[in-house]
């Protein structure tokens, strides 16, 4: 039985590789916008959305790999006002997201779900609170010059493993959760499932 990562995220792949996990990659084709719109129309708890998206991604790939473990992942960013942000689609969109978050705290939730033989056998989510500083327009322009288009793949428009760390004045939460993968609970499950050595 193989482990398949249903994500094209470079950072998630790098985190798993660094932890010694062997896996294949198969990108999930999921209409995230439709799921988010339905979620908001039903006024469901935004803190659970990342878990729903992670399961949807895992299921989309598991349909094609019924004999393997499929790992789906997702992260969401929710503003203090309860608005959900999506991945920025343009440099201007990224600038707008970052200006919206500047000087405030937001909640980043990362989730994982594993599907085996059509059933969810593991699911976990964790949240972190990140507080952005008030930054200047010149810093924002410099940041976008350095980080766009790579941050277009990041729901908050930032990557803490690079220049994005300078956007923040405070961070509360697990490092791996902030990177997009609640790694320690995931590794505990993978050991239990004999995917990695115990």
UniProtKB/Swiss-Prot annotation:
NCBIfam families, per the entry: maf (TIGR00172)
Entry cofactors: a divalent metal cation
UniProt keyword list: Cytoplasm, Hydrolase, Nucleotide metabolism
Subcellular location: Cytoplasm
Primary role: Nucleoside triphosphate pyrophosphatase. May have a dual role in cell division arrest and in preventing the incorporation of modified nucleotides into cellular nucleic acids.
InterPro entries in UniProt: ITPase-like_fam, Maf-like
Protein EC: 3.6.1.9
Organism whose genome encodes this protein: Zymomonas mobilis subsp. mobilis (strain ATCC 31821 / ZM4 / CP4)
PANTHER family xref list: BIFUNCTIONAL DTTP/UTP PYROPHOSPHATASE/METHYLTRANSFERASE PROTEIN-RELATED, BIFUNCTIONAL DTTP_UTP PYROPHOSPHATASE_METHYLTRANSFERASE PROTEIN-RELATED
Top-rank EC class of the record's enzyme: hydrolase
Superkingdom of source: Bacteria
Homology family: Belongs to the Maf family.
GO terms for cellular component: cytoplasm
Pfam family name, one: Maf
GO molecular function: nucleoside triphosphate diphosphatase activity
Main location: cytoplasm
Cited SUPFAM superfamilies: ITPase-like (SSF52972)
Catalytic activity from the UniProt record: a ribonucleoside 5'-triphosphate + H2O = a ribonucleoside 5'-phosphate + diphosphate + H(+); a 2'-deoxyribonucleoside 5'-triphosphate + H2O = a 2'-deoxyribonucleoside 5'-phosphate + diphosphate + H(+)
Signal peptide: none
GO annotation, biological process: nucleotide metabolic process
Residues spanning the membrane: none
Name the record gives this protein: Nucleoside triphosphate pyrophosphatase
Active-site annotation: 74
């Amino acid at each position: 039985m193989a482990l398949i990562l249903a994500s094209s995220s470079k950072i998630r792949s790098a985190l798993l590789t660094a932890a010694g996990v062997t896996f294949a990659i198969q990108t999930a084709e999921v209409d995230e916008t439709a799921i988010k719109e339905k979620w908001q129309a039903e006024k469901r708890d935004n803190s659970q959305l990342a878990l729903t998206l992670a399961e949807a991604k895992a299921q989309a790939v598991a349909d094609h790999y019924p004999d393997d473990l499929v790992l789906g992942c997702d992260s969401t960013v929710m503003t203090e006002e309860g608005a959900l942000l999506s991945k920025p689609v343009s440099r201007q969109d990224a600038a707008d997201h970052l200006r919206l978050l500047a000087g405030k705290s937001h909640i980043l939730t990362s989730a994982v779900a594993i599907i085996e033989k059509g059933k969810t056998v593991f699911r976990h989510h964790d949240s972190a609170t990140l507080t952005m500083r008030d930054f200047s327009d010149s810093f924002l322009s410099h940041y976008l010059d350095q980080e766009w288009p790579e941050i277009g793949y990041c729901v908050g428009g930032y990557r803490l493993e690079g220049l994005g760390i300078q956007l923040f004045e405070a961070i509360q939460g697990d490092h791996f959760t902030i990177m997009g993968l609640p790694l320690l609970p995931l590794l505990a499950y993978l050991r239990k499932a004999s995917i990695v050595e115990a």
